[in-house]
Amino acid sequence: MGSSGLLSLLVLFILLVNVQGPGLTDWLFPRRCPTIREECEFRERDVCTRHRQCPDNKKCCVFSCGKKCLDLKQDVCEMPNETGPCLAFFIRWWYDKKNNTCSTFVHGGCQGNNNNFQSEANCLNTCKNKRFP
């Protein structure tokens, strides 16, 4: 098979991947946990220790000062701030994509989402220089 045949197969493969959706591309090109270095005021409780402990094909990643289940297809910095259902009172930071800034919010101490940082510096380090579509 000549180079034009290989090129045709490559184009067909790319089109097939686009039609099949993310499932096939995730299998071929698995996403990895983020590698963001942060200075933590304290180590947070780990939510998981292995990928299989995470629901819905999420991955167990070191993120925001502890191990957390992350959906690698969803950008943490695009999530809204979520207080969670518990009634503790922790001042935390979240990234506001609309205003391109980090702001404080009160976290109840459980659940919520991963757009939840110990400090403004960690929030900015994770989200500020991202390019959003």
Curated annotation (Swiss-Prot):
Disulfide bonds: C33-C61, C40-C65, C48-C60, C54-C69, C77-C127, C86-C110, C102-C123
GO molecular function: serine-type endopeptidase inhibitor activity
InterPro entries to which the protein is assigned, alphabetical: Elafin-like_sf, Kunitz_BPTI, Kunitz_BPTI_sf, Prtase_inh_Kunz-CS, Serpin_venom_toxin, WAP_dom
Start and end residues of each BPTI/Kunitz inhibitor domain: 77-127
GO cellular component terms given for this protein: extracellular space
Domain WAP: 26-73
Top-rank lineage group of the source organism: Eukaryota
Main subcellular location of this protein, as a coarse class: secreted
Locations listed in the record: Secreted
Cell membrane keyword on record: no
One GO-annotated biological process of the protein: defense response to bacterium
Pfam families: Kunitz_BPTI, WAP
Keywords linked to the UniProt accession: Antimicrobial, Disulfide bond, Protease inhibitor, Secreted, Serine protease inhibitor, Signal
Family matches, as PROSITE patterns: BPTI_KUNITZ_1, BPTI_KUNITZ_2, WAP
Region annotated Interaction with SEMG1, chain positions: 102-133
Signal peptide: 1-21
Region (Interaction with LTF): 117-133
Keyword ATP-binding: no
Function: Serine protease inhibitor that plays an essential role in male reproduction and fertility. Modulates the hydrolysis of SEMG1 by KLK3/PSA (a serine protease), provides antimicrobial protection for spermatozoa in the ejaculate coagulum, and binds SEMG1 thereby inhibiting sperm motility.
Subunit structure: Monomer. Homodimer. Homomultimers. Interacts with SEMG1 (via 164-283 AA). Interacts with LTF. Found in a complex with LTF, CLU, EPPIN and SEMG1.
Name of this chain's protein: Eppin
